[in-house]
Amino acid sequence: MTADNSEQIAQWNGALGERWAAMQREIDRIVVPFGDAALRAAAPQPGERVIDVGCGCGDTSIELARSVGETGAVLGVDVSQPMLEVARARAVSTNRANLSFENVDASEAALPTETDLVFSRFGVMFFSQPFDAFRHLRKSLRKDGRCVFVCWRAPRDNPWATVSLSAARAAMGVTAGPSDPYAPGPFAFADDERVHAILSDAGFDAIRMQRVDVPLSLGTTARSAAQFALQVGPVSRFARESGFEHLPTILDAVERAFAPLAEAEGQVRLNGSTWIVSATNPG
């Protein structure tokens, strides 16, 4: 583990990782459409060897293992031990002998070589040194091997994240200050030109980026959507940093922001906007 990545790794092995592990089913339900779009772009084939970067609770790793079949192999890697415990249990329950997991930092760990596909669903935006990380990942690929991942586009295109955060800040009388758009986090890969530069610098070619938007169902009521938002996403961090005593105020503010956006039956759906990125290792 590098010193630069230590903060991220500590978070994903603490309360954050435990919370995501506990909410695995709900989180997977919401992001599955994006993962499916990335899987279609990756087109894993029987017999292929795949590395799933930032595999989390193993949802995409299991799908990849199904696609490559008994003659293929999938390695899911993640820094979060709590989430990997869920992933391993799910792999056992699905009887996937071609699937394994390792608790390592993909940006620097020794990874299998001659891999056919490096894949990730929302797992590559947290690298502290993304240029170095993708140089390292390319070394694991065979000649003409593929790298395919999905990442969030800009916050302005993702109201699922910004509506709740804006409401929380207003409730606390906080004005958003300047921030580093490239800092490790959900939106670090929003800038398509920077993503292209990272991959090009790492030695990839045939770089393609496709926009994929999907309405995200955050909850069946404004209240349940607000409760979910305070567990996952940018507003959850803001709420924690504001202090436990302010959680009721923030929850009520987010609920009020979601209420006029609810559909007739109460469902709260807000747009999620992503890049599906693919590239090839020329050798």
Predicted regions and their residues:
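Conserved hydrophobic residues forming the short capping helix/wall of the S-adenosyl-L-methionine
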Residues: V68, A91, A168, L199, ...
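Class I SAM-dependent methyltransferase SAM/SAH-binding core
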Residues: R49-A109, D132
